[in-house]
């Protein structure tokens, strides 16, 4: 499940249609009851993971703290900790992506998350990120580094087609590789294609071609260590041709919630996706990859839930296809 807790954000990315400021139409901070309702429906639908996303450091935006006060919290971190606890109690494993974070914030969240993530996007200084204090590459790399020091299973990724060069992509992949070789915590790297959004500064910017995406996937598979998966989003690009180039993971597919970052792109049905892939088998995993399940890279707080949901290989006990069929019974 994809739960966008708030879309209020200090960054002003040139391609983002998700961000709002307090007082703007569509600006929101989800109330606890809203989140709890989605979590309960998720359990009934057979979900195992909730992705909590946030605009980055919304507290820096005037008016946001009043919204927090209205739901009884003094900080976004305190609210997020409550939501993670609630998800675990409901039977869902949290995965948090809230932008750049300090070591102390990561330490607080580690026991309550199966994994966490932050898109590097690019090591290049880009026009798309000119008004984005959280998109300074060194700051993002530092967050990823601190997660490694804390042994948090981690997701990162590149955003393809936002003004970076092929050499920038290689440099970005090498930066992620360097951190993984030092700490061993990168589960997967997402190779995500830019998709223009109406009303944004980059609404007329060209999308990357399929050939560009193929090349980016090939680069990722060549540069990244073999134990790091390469992922693409099947709601943004047809994955079949990319699997032959090195893609090994298709990310999360929600039966309940939309992709709030790319709301125009519907999730594929799991069974339709399997038909499209033909003899390429799908196997469902948890938000923590099998190798990290086997290593015990999780806290006591979520240990019993991971053990209940995982098989002896570290994957999910019941395949996704069976779950989809069960929902119709």
Swiss-Prot record:
EC number annotated for this UniProt entry: 4.3.1.32
Limits of the Radical SAM core domain: 1-235
InterPro entries per UniProt: Aldolase_TIM, CofG_family, Elp3/MiaA/NifB-like_rSAM, F420, rSAM
Note on cofactor: Binds 1 [4Fe-4S] cluster. The cluster is coordinated with 3 cysteines and an exchangeable S-adenosyl-L-methionine.
Amino-acid positions noted as binding [4Fe-4S] cluster in the UniProt annotation, renumbered to this chain: 9, 13, 16
The UniProt record lists the keyword 4Fe-4S: yes
Keyword match Iron: yes
One Gene Ontology term of the molecular function aspect: transferase activity, transferring alkyl or aryl (other than methyl) groups
PROSITE patterns referenced in this protein's UniProt entry, alphabetically: RADICAL_SAM
Co-factor(s): [4Fe-4S] cluster
Pathway: Cofactor biosynthesis; coenzyme F0 biosynthesis
Entry keyword set: 4Fe-4S, Iron, Iron-sulfur, Lyase, Metal-binding, S-adenosyl-L-methionine
Catalytic activity from the UniProt record: 5-amino-5-(4-hydroxybenzyl)-6-(D-ribitylimino)-5,6-dihydrouracil + S-adenosyl-L-methionine = 7,8-didemethyl-8-hydroxy-5-deazariboflavin + 5'-deoxyadenosine + L-methionine + NH4(+) + H(+)
Family statement: Belongs to the radical SAM superfamily. CofG family.
Function: Catalyzes the radical-mediated synthesis of 7,8-didemethyl-8-hydroxy-5-deazariboflavin from 5-amino-5-(4-hydroxybenzyl)-6-(D-ribitylimino)-5,6-dihydrouracil.
HAMAP family in alphabetical order: FO_synth_sub1
Cross-referenced PANTHER family: 7,8-DIDEMETHYL-8-HYDROXY-5-DEAZARIBOFLAVIN SYNTHASE, FO SYNTHASE (COFH)
Self-association and partners: Consists of two subunits, CofG and CofH.
NCBIfam families: F420_cofG (TIGR03550), PRK06245.1 (NF004884)
Official protein name in the record: 7,8-didemethyl-8-hydroxy-5-deazariboflavin synthase
Species of provenance: Methanosarcina acetivorans (strain ATCC 35395 / DSM 2834 / JCM 12185 / C2A)
